[in-house]
UniProtKB/Swiss-Prot annotation:
Protein name according to UniProt: Large ribosomal subunit protein bL32c
GO process annotations (BP): translation
Any GO CC annotation of this UniProt entry: chloroplast
InterPro entries membership: Ribosomal_bL32, Ribosomal_bL32_plant/cyanobact, Ribosomal_zn-bd
Organism listed in the record: Lactuca sativa
Record lineage: Eukaryota, Viridiplantae, Streptophyta, Embryophyta, Tracheophyta
Pfam family, one: Ribosomal_L32p
Keywords: Chloroplast, Plastid, Ribonucleoprotein, Ribosomal protein
Molecular function per GO: structural constituent of ribosome
HAMAP family per UniProt: Ribosomal_bL32
Length: 54
């Protein structure tokens, strides 16, 4: 079983955690942006079928 030899420093742990959080932040921002463009009809990457309500 692999066991780390030394304890990870607090600063290194904080750096890794911030990188992980930043990735999630950008993914959420892109998803929100895509949702906004789909709702306004400005999306260039998705084709949304329009339903006629009459």
């Amino acid at each position: 079983m692999a066991v780390p030899k030394k304890r990870t420093s607090i600063s290194k742990k904080r750096i890794r955690k911030n990188i992980w959080k930043r990735k999630g932040y950008w993914a959420a921002l892109k998803a929100l942006s895509l949702g906004k463009s789909l709702s306004t009809g400005n999306s260039k990457s998705f084709f949304v079928r329009q339903t006629n309500k009459s």
